[in-house]
């Protein structure tokens, strides 16, 4: 059967959301991991948000007039981010995923780089991305739990303010070589970003500490990263934190485990194009 790749339309949104839910639920269940979405409706809401966002390039795969998959390219900043890419479970292993990936790679070929994060237990997607030029850069774990405790002397943690964005951009440039302010500014309104302030300076930020997929964080030091996470935890009541943590950052990993976080699943950061080993302390989002 032939497969056509085209731009997503409004009438595709519900189908794409249901496919997204079933695809992630199927692969997670096969490996005894919890699903990424609590319901089909949650995945449909994500599909609608991505389609409506002018800074996200959204495409579908269509076969015999039926939508069988979709993919997205986030275009907020210099580095592009892929995902989610999902294929109807009954239509997988037919080359559709490769075509969807080739389309977003072509779209992002003029950018500094393209990155993604995949479930480490999904051997099929790992092989596909590697064959398309993506290199494994970082082993990750998704963590969830409650971190609470006394902040180090002289550090304040509070919600982000307009005047903090320039400092956050500088933190990102120092850590990664590029900034992510457009992404930080355009988070959904129901998510709150936070900063840690020491000596009148912003020394850390975390963009969505209660929603791991959209959370990215950078800090001058591991102490500042621990402070911003603990400070957010203290402000969060019973709401748990969730984030992706690079497991090579062994001290931060052990600190997180000691302070109430638990590992939910392993993931892998992959990159195509420009990449520099991060400096300081950082947490990636599901994009990069």
Mark where each language-model region is.
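Surface-exposed beta-loop interaction hotspot
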Residues: 140-166
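Active-site rim helix/loop that mediates acceptor-substrate recognition in acyltransferases
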Residues: 17-58, 62-70, 173-193, 197
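Intrinsically disordered, low-complexity, positively biased terminal segments
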Residues: 1-3, 10, 56-58, 62-64, ...
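Conserved catalytic-core motifs of GNAT/GCN5-like acyltransferases
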Residues: 78, 113-119, 135-148, 263-275
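Active-site acidic-Proline motif in GNAT/NAT acetyltransferases
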Residues: 75, 88-90, 94, 221
């Amino acid at each position: 059967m032939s497969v056509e790749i085209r731009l997503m339309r409004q009438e595709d949104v519900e189908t794409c959301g249901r496919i997204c839910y079933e695809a992630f639920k199927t692969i997670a269940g096969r490996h005894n991991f919890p699903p990424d979405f609590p319901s089909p409706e949650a995945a449909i809401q994500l599909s609608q948000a991505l389609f409506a966002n002018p800074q996200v390039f959204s495409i579908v795969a269509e076969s015999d007039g039926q939508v069988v998959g979709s993919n997205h390219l986030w275009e907020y900043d210099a580095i592009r981010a892929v995902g989610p890419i999902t294929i109807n479970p009954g239509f997988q292993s037919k080359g559709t995923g490769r075509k969807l990936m080739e389309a977003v790679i072509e779209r992002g070929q003029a950018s500094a780089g393209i990155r993604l994060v995949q479930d480490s237990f999904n051997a099929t997607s790992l092989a596909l991305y590697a064959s398309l030029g993506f290199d494994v850069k970082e082993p990750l774990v998704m963590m969830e739990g409650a971190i609470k405790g006394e902040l180090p002397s002289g550090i304040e943690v509070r919600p982000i303010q307009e005047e903090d964005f320039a400092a956050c951009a500088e933190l990102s440039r120092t850590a990664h070589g590029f900034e992510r302010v457009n992404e930080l500014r355009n988070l959904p309104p129901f998510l709150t970003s936070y900063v840690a302030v020491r000596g009148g300076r912003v020394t850390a930020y975390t963009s969505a500490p209660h929603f791991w997929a959209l959370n990215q964080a950078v800090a001058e030091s591991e102490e500042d990263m621990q402070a911003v996470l603990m400070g957010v935890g203290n402000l969060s009541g019973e709401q748990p934190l969730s984030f992706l943590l690079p497991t090579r950052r062994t001290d931060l990993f052990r600190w997180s485990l000691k302070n109430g976080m638990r590992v939910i699943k392993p993931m892998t950061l992959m990159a195509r194009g420009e990449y520099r080993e991060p400096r300081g302390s950082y947490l990636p989002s599901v994009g990069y």
